[in-house]
Amino acid sequence: EKVVFYTQRSNGELAFLLEYAETQGCIVLDDMETYIRKHLFDAIQINTQLPKAELLVAAKLSKGKSLNWWKGIAMGLNKPMETDKLLMDLLAAPASTAKNMDKDVWKIFTAEVFAMIGKPQTEQPAEVLAQTVMDAIFDGLVSNQISASLLSIYHRCTSRHDMDAMMADYIARYTRLKEADPLKAHPDHPFLALDHALFKRLSHAIENGEFLAGYTQYIDARIQSRQAVSYKAAWLKDVKTIVEFKNGELYKVASLQDFATYYRAHFAVLDTAVRHLYAAWLHDEKWLRPFQYLYEQAEKELLDKWFALAKDYQPSQQGLLKEKLSGKGRIAILVCDGLRLEIAETIYQQAKSKKSNDYAFAMLPSVTENGMSA
């Protein structure tokens, strides 16, 4: 059985104990730096120029590492401390990360963290340091002036579902949103409040007849952000649909059949978008009204076309139900107005397996109390 004796006495004071220690050799640790440099040279034949503090930290972090790892450290090709990994650990579990870290490693780690966020180093509890880091990241996202390293850390945080609860806490404790410009923020930002502010600014711009290209470009970037999936407003894509919608192909509609095809293929998405905005903003009529106005303009063009064609309507659907029910296979019959047709069409377009559809006509369209075509 192997036994290790540890003592702080000099060799001359060990007396008979030295005989036991010398059985397998005596390791003198009163000069740890010299000991590490000597054994490192014996192992890899490299005289490293690492400063003492960094060398000691490397030794403490070397457990489980290979000689190739040590070669990279000794030659200055790699840093002994994986700051990004340790920072992710800190953000995910501040208290346990600090508790399990050697005090010398913690000191160098915190120095590198403060350098990364561009702030003077101060003594902080782990939880406060973690919030300080996230506040720096949020500041960079809000101003769209964030370093590549901090943006990478943020993306790693948003991609980890086990950090969702921690991220929600960090976001809730961030207090510098009041003066933020929603159009200047990085599109990956995690603030639903900025999406609401953007909606209100766009509403005001529509009401005043302003140029909207800058808004739609930003909204498009926000919609496409994969990192903001859990944080952005679901209705942003509906805002884009309403603002950009044009009845460009309506002039080609020459029959009721053309009209039905046009509605399903082109106009139904606008009805869907407005329905989603009503669900989200119906109690904020002031901000919703300009978007409703855009919708009503497009709807009027659609209804004008319908009434122009309806006078030529001739019944052509006698026996339609009997004909369809006589077919083989499973048949679904939906009796609905245009609003429900729009919902059904949305579901149909999202279905993986497309089935054949036939549509019957009502005599006249209707308009709901909120102005939706039906």
Label the predicted regions.
Residues 1-330, 338-374:
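…; additionally, a secondary subgroup of soluble metalloenzymes is captured
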